[in-house]
A protein has these predicted regions:
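Pre-Walker A (pre-P-loop) alpha-helix and adjacent loop at the N terminus of AAA/AAA+ ATPase modules
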Residues: 2-40
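Conserved C-terminal "switch" segment of AAA+ ATPases
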Residues: 10-12, 252-341, 376-377
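Helical mechanochemical/support elements of P-loop NTPase systems and associated helical scaffolds
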Residues: 14-18, 45, 146-151, 191-196, ...
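Conserved alpha-helical scaffold flanking the Walker A/P-loop in AAA+ ATPase domains
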Residues: 21-25, 124, 128, 158-184
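Conserved RecA-like P-loop NTPase ATPase core
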Residues: 22, 34, 154, 187, ...
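Walker A/P-loop
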Residues: 24-146
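C-terminal engagement/docking regions of AAA+ P-loop ATPases
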Residues: 38-44, 331-519
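Canonical AAA+ ATPase core
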Residues: 53, 57, 162-164, 183-196, ...
Length: 519
C-alpha cells in the first residue's frame, strides 16, 4: 500500500520510525505530532506522502450570463451531489471547490469535485455542466508558522465575487488553506499560541466557523503539527514532558537529523519523486481505515495495555503523618509530592501519569495500524508495545527526575517505565492474577479485601503495594459503574411501569398502583 516505497525515501533510522508513524496516522485518524530539530525532513515527509496519493476530480464547468443562471446551476448541482444548496453557494462543502471566471466577456462557473467524497460528480453532465475527469495528486498545505500570523492566513476567508458584481452573497476562498487541503503541516505551530488554540479545536472537531458565512465540516486525511525539541535553543516551544493537553494528537514521532550521506541520498530521491506517478488513490486510504478498525487485538496484549493504563492513572498519595488513602484518584486531580508518599516504591504513576481514556483508545488504534502495515491479521504484543512508544511520550505528565535519569530522553524514559511495569508484573504475578480473575467475575468482595476495605477480612500485606492497589481499585470502579448502570436500568423500568399504569388505571387504582410500583 505504498508504505514500503514511502519509507524507502528516507535513509535515517529516525526518519524510518517517523515514516511509519505518519502512515499509521494516515490509516487511523490522521493526527500526528512531529518533534525534531531543523533539517530533519519533517516538511518533506508530508509533501512526499501527499504526492504518493491521487484522487479523481470531476471538473464541472458552465457558462452563465446572470445571477439567476448561477442560482439554477448550483441548485441542480446541489441536488445531484446530495449537499446543502446554501453551503454549496458559499463554498462550504468539503471536497468541492467553487470558482468564478470571466475571460473575454465569457462568465464561467467551475466546480472542482473530489470523487472520493462525491461519487455523483460525473452526473453533473445531466444538469448542463461540461464535465472533465482527471487524476491529480492530493494537495498539501505546509506552512512555517510565525508569531505574527493571523488565523485567517490558514483557514481562508470570505470574498465577494467580482464576476457577479456584488449581486451574490460572499463565498469562502479556500483553495490555499486548511479548509481545502487533505494534508496539513504547521511547522513550529506552538510559537503562535492563538493559532495553536484555534488548531486545537480544528484537530478535534474538524470544523471551521466563519462569522457571517457559516461552518465548513472538513475531513482532512492527515494533520501534522511540528515542533522542535525542548532545550535552550528552542525557548518558544511547549515543554513536552508536562504537556498532557497534547493528547489530542494520536501519535507523536521524534525525528533527528540524518547523517550527511543519508541527507544527499534523501534529497536525490525526493527530486526523482516529482516525476513518479502516484502509487495509490484516496479511496484506498478509506478502505484501509475500515480494515484497520475491524482488526482484532490479541487478548493478552490488550489485557496488559489495560493493566498499564490502570497503574498510570491511579494515585494513593499518603504521607506517614496522614491516614493512608484507601481509594485511588487521578494523579491530575490532586497536588502532591511523590517523594513524600509512603507508596512511592511500588507506584508507577510517580514516573509518568496519564489519563486512561485517550491513551487506551489511541494505543489500540495505532497498534492495529502498525500490525496492518506489517501485513498481520491481528495486533500482537509487539504491535501494542510499538504503539505505546508513539502514544505515551507527549501524552504523559512525566517526572522531571525520571526524565533526567534517562538522559533527558523521553523515549528512553518510556523504555524505563515499561521495564518497571514488567518487573512489577513478575514480582506480584499471583496478586495481579487474583485481581484480574476477580474483575472478570465481578467479585467485589475479593477486590475490597485486597484494598483493605472488607470489614470481614483481615488486612493483607499486598494492601501496601501501590501497583496492586491501583489494579484492584480500578477494577472496583468498573464494578461499581456496572452496578450503577444496572440500578439505573431497573429505575428506568420502574418509571416506565408507573407511567403505563397511570395511563391505563382508573382513579381508584392509581394510589395502589403507585405504591405497588414503589415496592
Amino acid at each position: 500500500m505504498a508504505f514500503r516505497e514511502f519509507s524507502a525515501l528516507f535513509a535515517g533510522k529516525s526518519q524510518q520510525v517517523a515514516a511509519r508513524a505518519l502512515f499509521a496516522s494516515l490509516i487511523t485518524d490522521g493526527k500526528v505530532l512531529l518533534v525534531g530539530a531543523h533539517g530533519a525532513f519533517k516538511s518533506s515527509m508530508i509533501r512526499a506522502l501527499s504526492s504518493l496519493i491521487s484522487t479523481k476530480y470531476a471538473v464541472a464547468e458552465k457558462e452563465f450570463s446572470d445571477v439567476r443562471e448561477v442560482k439554477e446551476a448550483l441548485s441542480s448541482a446541489a441536488s445531484k451531489l446530495g449537499v446543502n444548496l446554501e453551503e454549496l453557494e458559499r463554498n462550504l462543502v468539503y471536497g468541492v471547490n467553487m470558482k468564478y471566471g470571466d475571460a473575454f466577456g465569457v462568465k464561467k462557473l467551475t466546480l472542482e469535485i473530489d470523487e472520493a467524497y462525491h461519487e455523483e460528480a460525473p452526473r453533473l453532465k445531466e444538469c448542463g455542466f461540461s464535465v472533465k475527469e482527471e487524476v491529480r495528486r492530493l494537495p498539501s498545505f505546509v506552512m512555517l508558522v510565525s508569531p505574527s500570523d493571523e488565523i485567517q492566513d490558514y483557514v481562508g476567508h470570505p470574498v465577494t465575487s467580482k464576476v457577479l458584481r456584488g449581486d451574490w452573497p460572499p463565498h469562502l476562498e479556500k483553495e490555499n488553506s486548511i479548509a481545502h487541503a487533505p494534508f496539513i503541516l504547521l511547522d513550529e505551530m506552538f510559537v503562535n499560541p492563538k493559532l495553536a488554540a484555534a488548531m486545537h479545536t480544528f484537530v478535534n472537531e474538524k470544523e471551521i466557523h466563519y462569522p457571517g458565512l457559516g461552518t465548513i465540516r472538513t475531513d482532512y486525511l492527515l494533520f501534522a503539527a511540528a515542533t522542535n525539541p525542548v532545550n535552550e535553543n528552542y525557548q518558544t516551544n511547549p515543554n513536552l514532558r508536562n504537556m498532557a493537553t497534547l493528547d489530542r494528537f494520536t501519535i507523536c514521532a521524534f525525528v533527528s537529523t540524518p547523517d550527511s550521506r543519508s541527507v544527499e541520498e534523501t534529497i536525490r530521491k525526493l527530486e526523482i519523486l516529482k516525476d513518479v506517478p502516484p502509487l495509490i488513490d484516496e479511496k484506498t486510504i478509506f478502505s484501509a481505515r475500515s480494515e484497520v478498525e475491524k482488526m482484532p487485538i490479541e487478548k493478552d496484549a490488550e489485557q496488559k495495555l489495560m493493566l498499564l493504563a490502570d497503574v498510570l492513572d491511579s494515585c494513593f498519595f499518603s504521607t506517614a503523618q496522614l491516614e493512608r488513602r484507601e481509594r485511588g484518584t487521578s494523579p491530575f486531580l490532586i497536588q502532591h509530592e511523590c517523594s513524600l508518599c509512603v507508596f512511592k516504591d511500588t507506584c508507577l504513576a510517580r514516573f509518568a501519569s496519564v489519563s486512561t481514556t485517550r491513551f487506551v483508545i489511541s494505543v489500540k488504534k495505532v497498534a492495529k495500524a502498525v500490525a496492518y502495515l506489517s501485513g498481520k491479521q491481528k495486533a500482537e504484543m509487539e504491535d501494542v508495545a510499538a504503539a505505546i512508544f508513539y502514544v505515551l511520550p507527549h501524552r504523559a505528565k512525566w517526572s522531571e527526575d525520571f526524565i533526567e535519569e534517562n538522559g533527558g530522553n523521553v523515549q528512553r524514559a518510556v523504555v524505563g517505565l515499561l521495564e518497571r511495569f514488567s518487573y512489577f508484573l513478575r514480582k506480584y504475578e499471583q496478586d495481579v492474577k487474583r485481581v484480574v480473575e476477580a474483575s472478570e467475575k465481578g467479585d467485589v468482595t475479593t477486590l475490597l479485601t485486597i484494598l483493605g476495605l472488607n470489614p470481614n477480612a483481615p488486612k493483607e500485606a499486598v494492601g501496601d503495594v501501590a501497583f496492586v492497589k491501583a489494579l484492584a481499585d480500578q477494577a472496583l470502579k468498573r464494578a461499581e459503574a456496572t452496578l450503577l448502570k444496572h440500578r439505573d436500568f431497573l429505575n428506568d423500568k420502574k418509571k416506565e411501569a408507573t407511567r403505563q399504569f397511570l395511563e391505563t388505571a382508573g382513579d381508584e387504582e392509581t394510589l395502589a398502583g403507585v405504591e405497588l410500583t414503589r415496592q
